[in-house]
Design a protein with these regions (language model features):
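Short, hydrophobic-biased segments on the C-terminal half of alpha helices
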Residues: 275-279, 485-486
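Intrinsically disordered, low-complexity regulatory segments
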Residues: 1-139, 148, 209, 218-221, ...
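A short, conserved structural fragment
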Residues: 282-297, 491-500
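C-terminal or mid-to-C-terminal helical accessory/interaction module adjacent to the motor/catalytic core
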Residues: 112-194, 244
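Structured, non-catalytic alpha/beta "coupling" segments that mediate domain-domain communication
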Residues: 14-37, 168-215, 383-432, 588
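Short acidic, hydrophobic short linear motifs in intrinsically disordered regions
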Residues: 238-241, 250-263, 290-299, 457-469
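Basic, low-complexity terminal or inter-domain segments flanking catalytic cores
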Residues: 2-4, 15, 150, 160, ...
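Metal- or metallocofactor-binding catalytic centers and their adjacent structured scaffolds
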Residues: 215-252, 441
Length: 694
């Protein structure tokens, strides 16, 4: 008889089955098989918060099949993912199949390759009860908060709403940022720039200080003009010249959070889209010449550790592709910020076979998986390459009673940047390409220009910056970031506006109520401490039941007080105004949020029940018919697309966003795809890079 190996998915089963051969039967549980009941609390609060698990609806036949296979197998091994959720799935499987959780029937694979599977199978272990209890504690806490708090929101705000231990904090961060933007008062300032000539070349230096070294930043046009007047007839002389060298180091290989952030910035992926592609790469794809294999190590990790074997493989590739000079001459190590012992058991996210290049893989895979593999592979390889070496120069130019400054650098050795550089959300400080200069050199003033500027409010969060904020504040865990963002958007608390996350009126109303009645639930520091307590459960330093009880006692008291405070009261969510008029009665229409998203409703409801689909005019004109306006719409799955308003006669649609810039060749609306703008008019073919912002 063969041994039975149970994993989560058919794809993973297929890949592992290839390596194990005929002595093993590999089958899939299709994810979780048991959970808390959907229709009731399912937790015995009076008896140690004991969860009352039931089989998930629709899994009865699968469970029966698994029991039959286990009964006739020569042993059972549980090979679910090496994390909290995977441990929980294995615990429930052991429970249903009658396996002793203390026996060595649990195996894990950090990478699904021949080597990784062999390594995992050689080290079976008992189920990690601390890891399972950490998952169980989170599940129980989330159920208690959701099940107790959601009905309160239904009564006081609107039916169908939900609140969560972590999602509510995420909404608060987004709402707090919106308040900062609304309350921001811009300050005027002026930049004074001198374009200076040195021989046939010129460069720009900016006013920095007065003669005494006091920083100068004119606050008005009058101040700027006074400085210009003081510079009339002045000589511009190089008064200080500093030369130096600097080394720029690569960023480490990805962890879950940085993978999600970089995929958002570089590829435009949502966190959910990133993790879906990463799961596919981990579980296995069919690669020409290799068959089914996992292309990356496990993608839910907080660890920056890289195995010596992987480092050696990377350096071997770098030497062959770039030369010995491009290999980092020492062993790079990065300190893992906050990983628990269980999390640090994994490596960082890296290619499972470093010598397998993206170009070779691209012959077998495409789309999101190909793009993500290229990014993971490049980042890992770059992390083992030599520093980028730069010569730096900074110059101070004195004129009358003022000092101007400029700085620049020259790359003397590209190092890791020959392969990869991290994308960034912040605008980098501009550095000028300076001509050769000497101390005491007199420069020619070519232009003196003053430009009005205003301080800018903080930017709205993107998925990347929200994930970064959640991580920095210790809110949630990287594996939960994708579902958190999906949930707050699906619930109508937050919406995407040009990749920025903006709170809706509903989201702001709910956040205000939560802040007023349950301040600890949405308190960032409280939530971070809760995560630390749960990490202690995972590392065996705290009892999960006591951790839950410590939270629940305070939460229950807050809920009782909130019911008293809000007795007879209800929070009114203001309707969002629109420019549309009701076709039935002529009253203005307002934007409401329903089960399937936003729609237009007559402000005269309930006297008038007029409704319309909500569409947004992009300002662009259809490139196909040349007449209809381009409208923003949503697919049945909630994805935004753009189509012609004359949809009964014109079938033009695209996922790519129209922009204000017009085609230089034919004058049509341009569309953005990645880093380029293109014209969609048949026969035109015009393309251009996306213009850079100052």
């Amino acid at each position: 008889m063969a041994k039975l190996v149970i994993v989560e998915s058919p794809a993973k089963a297929k890949t592992i089955g290839k390596y194990l051969g005929d002595d093993y039967e590999v089958t899939a549980s299709m994810g979780h098989i048991r959970d808390l009941p959907a229709s009731q609390l399912g937790i015995d609060v009076e008896h140690g918060y004991t969860p009352q698990y039931i089989s998930i609806k629709g899994k009865e036949k699968l469970i029966k099949e698994l029991k039959s296979k286990a009964k006739h197998a020569d042993g059972v091994l549980l090979a679910t993912d090496p994390d909290r959720e995977g441990e929980a799935i294995s615990w429930h499987l052991a429970n249903i199949l009658g396996l002793d959780p203390h026996e060595p029937n649990r195996v894990t694979f950090d990478e699904i390759t021949k080597k990784g599977v062999k390594e995992g199978m050689a080290h079976p272990r008992a189920i990690d009860e601390d890891l399972f209890n950490a998952q169980q504690a989170r599940r129980v806490l989330d159920r208690l908060v959701g099940y107790k708090l959601s009905p309160f929101l239904w009564r006081k705000v609107r039916r169908g709403l939900s609140a969560g231990r972590v999602q509510s904090v995420a909404v608060r961060l987004i709402d707090d940022r919106e308040k900062e933007i609304e309350n921001f008062k811009p300050d005027e300032y002026w930049n004074v720039d001198a374009t200076l000539g040195a021989g046939h070349k010129s460069f720009v230096a900016r006013l920095a200080t007065d003669a005494n070294g006091k920083k100068l930043l004119p606050k008005s046009e009058a101040e700027a003009r006074a400085i210009e007047k003081g510079l009339e007839g002045a000589s511009y002389v190089v008064s200080e010249l500093k030369r130096g060298k600097r080394a720029k180091q690569p960023t480490p290989a990805f962890i879950t959070s940085t993978l999600q952030q970089e995929a958002s910035r570089r590829l435009g992926f949502t966190a959910t889209r990133t993790m879906r592609a990463a799961q596919t790469l981990y579980e296995g794809v069919d690669i020409a010449g290799h068959g089914m294999m996992g292309l990356i190590t496990y993608m839910r990790t907080d660890s920056l550790r890289i195995s010596d074997e992987a480092v050696a493989a990377a350096k071997e590739y770098i030497a062959g592709a770039y030369g010995e000079a491009y290999i980092c001459p020492y062993k790079r190590t990065w300190k893992t910020k906050s990983a628990t012992a269980a999390q640090d058991a994994h490596e960082a996210i890296r290619p499972s076979v470093p010598s397998l290049t993206p170009d070779e893989v691209d012959k077998s895979i495409s789309g999101d998986t190909a793009k993500l593999y290229r990014m993971i592979w490049s980042r890992f390889m770059a992390s083992q390459m030599a520093d980028c070496q730069q010569d730096t120069v900074s110059v101070t130019v004195s004129a009358a009673d003022y000092h101007f400054k400029a700085s620049g650098y020259t790359v003397t050795f590209d190092g890791f940047t020959a392969l990869y550089e991290e994308a960034t959300d912040e605008k980098e400080k501009k550095e000028t390409n300076l001509p050769p200069l000497e101390q005491g050199q007199v420069l020619k003033l070519r232009e003196l220009k003053s430009e009005q500027k205003f301080t800018q409010p903080p930017a709205r969060y993107t998925e990347a910056t929200l994930i970064k904020a959640l991580e920095e504040n210790g809110i949630g865990r990287p594996s939960t970031y994708a579902p958190i963002i999906t949930t707050i958007i699906d619930r109508g608390y937050v919406e995407r506006d040009q990749k920025k996350l903006k709170p809706t009126l509903l989201g702001r109303a709910v956040d205000g109520l939560m802040l007023e009645q349950f301040p600890h639930i949405v308190d960032v520091d409280f939530s971070a401490q809760m995560e630390k307590n749960l990490d202690k459960v995972e590392s065996g330093k705290a009892d999960w039941r006591k951790t839950v009880d410590d939270f629940y006692q305070g939460f229950e008291a807050s809920l009782e007080q909130a019911e008293k405070n809000m007795e007879g009261k209800k929070v009114k969510v203001p309707d969002e105004p629109s420019s549309e008029v009701c076709d039935l009665c002529g009253r203005p229409m307002v934007i409401k949020v329903g089960k399937y998203g936003k729609f237009l409703a007559c402000s005269g409801f309930p006297e008038c029940r007029g409704t319309k689909r909500l569409v947004k005019d992009t300002g662009g004109i259809c490139p196909k018919c040349g007449k209809g306006r381009l409208l923003e719409r949503k697919s049945s799955k909630g994805r935004i697309y753009y189509g012609c308003e004359c949809y009964s006669d014109c079938d033009f649609m695209t996922w790519d966003m129209p922009v204000a810039t017009k085609c230089e060749k034919c004058g049509s609306t341009l569309f953005r795809k990645g880093g380029k703008l293109y014209c969609a008019k048949e026969g035109c073919g015009f393309e251009m890079p996306v213009p850079k912002k100052d």
